[in-house]
């Protein structure tokens, strides 16, 4: 899509449902029937949605995105990249939110629980069962399985 060109058909729409206007730095959202996704950008890092698209979500701060199930299926890897970069994707079906896709912060959770004293780091090796020998089966397991199948 060329910047500054008048939107005349659905072919002028980029994959985020945004069409350009005469001014290159201003983007105008399309009517709801043509809109594939609604993007809320933080104005600190990305000025336009095309900046966000070109950077593949790594340089832009994205607050949240509403995306239809159809668009999610068509470009799943791009939406996963967005979630991995820290963005939040709200999945909608016929305009109704049904799910939220966000990155997992498992390392932060572990650090927080360790700092609160809820969990601690392992200090020793796991104890090995000692004192009793392993029980030996009286007959093979395959015989028992075949008995159960009869």
UniProtKB/Swiss-Prot annotation:
This protein's record includes keyword ATP-binding: no
Region (Disordered): 124-150
Induction: Induced in persister cells in response to D-cycloserine.
Organism superkingdom: Bacteria
InterPro entries reported for this sequence: Antitoxin_Phd/YefM, phD-YefM_TA_antitoxins, YefM-like_sf
SUPFAM superfamilies: YefM-like
Pfam families listed in its UniProt record: PhdYeFM_antitox
Stored Gene3D superfamilies: YefM-like domain
PANTHER family given in the database record: ANTITOXIN VAPB46, ANTITOXIN VAPB49-RELATED-RELATED
Protein name, as recorded: Putative antitoxin VapB49
Species, as recorded: Mycobacterium tuberculosis (strain ATCC 25618 / H37Rv)
Lineage per the UniProt record: Bacteria, Bacillati, Actinomycetota, Actinomycetes, Mycobacteriales
């Amino acid at each position: 899509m060329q910047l500054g060109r008048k939107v005349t058909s659905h072919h002028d729409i980029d994959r985020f449902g945004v069409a350009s206007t005469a001014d290159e730095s201003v983007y105008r959202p399309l009517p709801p029937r043509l809109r594939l996704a609604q993007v809320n950008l933080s104005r600190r890092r990305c000025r336009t949605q095309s900046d966000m698209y070109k950077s593949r979500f790594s340089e832009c701060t994205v607050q949240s995105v509403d995306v239809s199930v159809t668009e999610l299926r068509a470009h799943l890897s791009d939406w996963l990249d967005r979630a991995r970069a820290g963005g939040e994707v709200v999945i909608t079906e016929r305009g109704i939110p049904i799910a939220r896709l966000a990155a997992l912060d498992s390392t932060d959770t572990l650090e927080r629980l360790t700092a609160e004293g809820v969990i601690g780091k392992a200090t020793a090796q796991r104890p090995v069962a000692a004192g009793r020998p392993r029980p030996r089966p009286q007959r093979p397991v395959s015989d028992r399985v075949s008995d159960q199948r009869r």
